[in-house]
Amino acid sequence: MLIIPAIDIKDGKCVRLTRGDFSQQKIYLDNPLDMAIIWRKQNAKMLHIVDLDAALTGEMVNFDIIANIVAELDIPVQIGGGIRSIDAVKRYLDMGVGRVVIGSAAVTDPELVGELMKHWPASKIVVGIDAENGVPKIKGWTESSGMQDYELALRMKDMGVERIVYTDISRDGMMQGFGYESTKRFAQKAGLKVTASGGVTNSEDLQRLATLRPYGVDSVIIGKAFYECNFPCQELWYNFEKGICLDQNFSTARRK
């Protein structure tokens, strides 16, 4: 099970939201690059970054910040948030992003996904489905799509998509456990590779999530639980007297 730390960027800062609510925002670091380096030093094998400003506006507001992160680290970076055109995808992939996540556009402009699959392999293009009670939400979770989550997944599957990033909005940022039943139901019906997201709070959640591997759930994105140090092993990664060093510590993880 690949564990992927999340970095959400809003107004140039590293933040976390509760259930996607922009009014419930907590700033963790002013510089998202520092956060990315911390996660890499803690041996992350991949990062999931969301441009929250872009999710709302469709403009690549934090492009330069993301470019700095991609240039600095030696691991794949997955990008989501407001990616709604071939040009945006090309700019990210040309920058060196490992793969892009298409969210709202999969609902509002499904033909775009078909075009993307003609230009790039499925390993580069994934679709993000953020669902509440089984219904995908779009445009920064502010609008309903009017279809079932698995229906959208099957449409994307027909276009050549092989992986879905699935978020149970009701669990995201709540620190109350992930949506086991909703994720299992979705994975069973979709028949695709699934990266679970939203609500994983502790090691027990990870163990439960691992039981869904037979249904295609092979990875998980973790946000707030990491930021709140909910995993005991994180205490070993921090130097509480001096603070974590971004340039060198006992980790063998490398920066470029």
Curated annotation (Swiss-Prot):
Keywords: Amino-acid biosynthesis, Cytoplasm, Histidine biosynthesis, Isomerase
Protein name: 1-(5-phosphoribosyl)-5-[(5-phosphoribosylamino)methylideneamino] imidazole-4-carboxamide isomerase
Catalyses which reaction(s): 1-(5-phospho-beta-D-ribosyl)-5-[(5-phospho-beta-D-ribosylamino)methylideneamino]imidazole-4-carboxamide = 5-[(5-phospho-1-deoxy-D-ribulos-1-ylimino)methylamino]-1-(5-phospho-beta-D-ribosyl)imidazole-4-carboxamide
Catalytic site: D8 (proton acceptor), D130 (proton donor)
Main location: cytoplasm
Subcellular location(s) per record: Cytoplasm
GO terms assigned for molecular function: 1-(5-phosphoribosyl)-5-[(5-phosphoribosylamino)methylideneamino]imidazole-4-carboxamide isomerase activity
Record InterPro entries: Aldolase_TIM, His_biosynth, HisA_bact_arch, Isoase_HisA-like, Isoase_HisA-like_bact, RibuloseP-bd_barrel
Pathway(s) it belongs to: Amino-acid biosynthesis; L-histidine biosynthesis; L-histidine from 5-phospho-alpha-D-ribose 1-diphosphate: step 4/9
Protein's GO biological process: L-histidine biosynthetic process; L-tryptophan biosynthetic process
Family per record: Belongs to the HisA/HisF family.
Gene field: hisA
UniProt superkingdom: Bacteria
GO CC entries: cytoplasm
Enzyme Commission no: 5.3.1.16
Pfam families reported in the protein's UniProt record: His_biosynth (PF00977)
